[in-house]
Design a protein with these regions (language model features):
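Conserved acetyl-CoA-binding loop-helix of GNAT-fold acetyltransferases
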Residues: 88-91, 97-114, 133-137
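Acidic/histidine-enriched, glycine/proline-rich intrinsically disordered or flexible terminal extensions
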Residues: 153-184
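Conserved beta-strand-loop-alpha-helix junction that forms the acyl-donor binding cleft
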Residues: 122-131, 148-158
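Hydrophobic adenine-recognition pocket in adenosine-nucleotide-binding enzymes
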Residues: 12, 89-91, 124
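A short beta-loop-alpha structural element at the N-terminal edge
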Residues: 8-20
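Conserved acetyl-CoA-binding loop of GNAT-fold acetyltransferases
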Residues: 135-145
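Conserved GNAT acetyl-CoA-binding A-motif
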Residues: 112-124
């Protein structure tokens, strides 16, 4: 898949940290630049010298704004036999729905091949269930089958054929009270 007209890719360069954080703030992952920068350094500092070959941005042609990102990470310890992972995939909310996700997935798969990973693990979560569906559509397989509630939530929301072994759950099970509790 190719990026739509008006967008291009750029690889990470030292100094792009705050733009990476802003993508994640505007996609709902972080609430502050400080928290985002802490996550960035906690996660990437162990392979920061390789980041210019592993972290990519989607950039608008018109303004040069970085609006999406994904990284092929080096895992400190292998997971399920994989040493590389797709991490920190995000697109700013105002750019979601513009057919950028499939090109970004294609790009991170290309990057993985270029840096020597023939297989990847990908982490996702139920709060980004549309992304989870897209990853399954793209051919990713479920490895952590024991995470039954998460996969059942995804089945309820998407009815994806790869989730046939999981039962659907109720709305109450999807809306964990810890996530929707409001204090006065």
């Amino acid at each position: 898949y190719e990026l739509p007209e008006g967008f291009h890719y750029e690889f990470y360069k030292p100094g792009d940290e705050e733009e990476w954080v802003m993508i994640h703030i505007e996609s709902g992952e972080f609430t502050s630049i400080e928290k985002g920068l802490k996550h960035f350094h906690d996660f990437y500092d162990s392979f920061i010298e390789e980041l210019p070959n592993r972290c990519v941005f989607i950039v608008t042609d018109a303004t040069g704004e970085k609006i999406g990102t994904a990284t092929i990470s080096l895992l400190k310890e292998p997971e399920y036999g994989y040493d590389g992972a797709v991490d920190w995939v995000a697109i700013k909310k105002r750019y979601q729905g513009r057919h950028l996700s499939k090109p970004l997935i294609s790009k991170f798969m290309e990057i993985a091949n270029n840096v020597g990973h023939s297989k990847l693990i990908l982490h996702t979560q139920t709060t980004t269930w549309l992304a989870g569906k897209l990853y399954l559509d793209y051919g990713f397989e479920i490895l952590n089958k024991e995470e039954k509630l998460g996969w059942s939530i995804l089945k309820t929301l998407t009815n994806h054929s790869k989730l046939s072994e999981y039962d659907k759950v109720s709305q109450e099970e999807i809306l964990d009270s810890r996530n929707v509790e409001i204090e006065r």
